[in-house]
Amino acid sequence: MVMSMLTIDPVTTPKERRAFARMTVDLYKDDPNFVQPLDYEFLARLNPQSNPLLANSPHQLWLARRGGRVVGRIGAIINRNYQDHYGKSAGHFGYFEAIDDRAVIDQLFDTAAQWLRARHMVEMAGPYNFSVNEECGLLVEGFDRPPAVMMPHGKPYYAPALEAMGFTKASDMFALWYPARYGFMPEKRQAFVDKVVNRPKVEVRSFDFANFESEILTAVEIFNDAWANNWGFVPLSEAEARHMASELRPIITRYNTVMCSVDGEPSAFGIVLPNINEVIGGFDGKLLPFNWAKFLWWLKVQKPKTARMPLMGIRQKLQGKPLGAAFAFKIIEMVNNSSVDHGIVNAELSWILESNKPMIAMLEDIGAVIDKRYRIYEKPLVAA
């Protein structure tokens, strides 16, 4: 039997972008833990007119086909925000998915590497879809639970395939699973937190939803300061922050947010998202015409049972100090209690860098357990 020829084709049309988005439907048809992204949301992320990052960052997508069937995909990007921040000639790959076939996987990565090399990149790292501030990391442990909102899934054969091509670990990130409940803090710690945050010059509140975009911009400004020294950090631009605000606004509520200020200066924040993957897993990527009503019913009436905390930040000048520690616990306490009030049973805290041992220890101390590991890989690009 003659095997059909494998081709790697650049994505250039709306029809091909849709094929790029939909190829995972067949790939994961036997995996009950995979959640197909909503088509409109996924395609918007690939559109430079709606995604600020792509507007100024060269990028390309490819589809692998064999016998007319899509068997893989990959994207490559020269992230200008990353370039400006680090000054490194490192290109990134993302959106990688493929059948369990080394020829397919190897040719996808060879194609992406050639594209990056032709643009003078000397290193290839990822997966980033297409940024460290979006979905990123290859799932290497924890395939037995569906991903939380805005987190990736994957196949167990991906990591061995990348390592066989010479990719090595750059960093690991964890997702921790947390049982939401009242009274999670020991009595002495609760007394410490209450004493510190109840000072006259300290304010702890929910976001002002009448000025939601402004609140998100403030949160991003804190985030950029708080995480500036962390591995892989790339600051969020104002355009990305505004884009984030528009994406989050439909699913976020006051009880999902906390803002902490000292002497009138916003100094720490936290955001929790309802885990929409609970419900969209049955939508096959389609929200309209009927699934929109199902989504609203789930969000407003049935209520989500799980959530994810993707964003928390404390200004550097407070880190390592009693007020910074108190803010961290107070943020978790507030979103925990309000989440329980609204029916949340479990929450994912993600992602946390493997090297951030103080944060991991703090979360484990309140009952969270590491149950997913994601990995960023890197590889030098040798001249062809």
Model regions: which residues?
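Acyltransferase donor/substrate-recognition loop-hinge adjacent to the catalytic core
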Residues: 152-232, 256
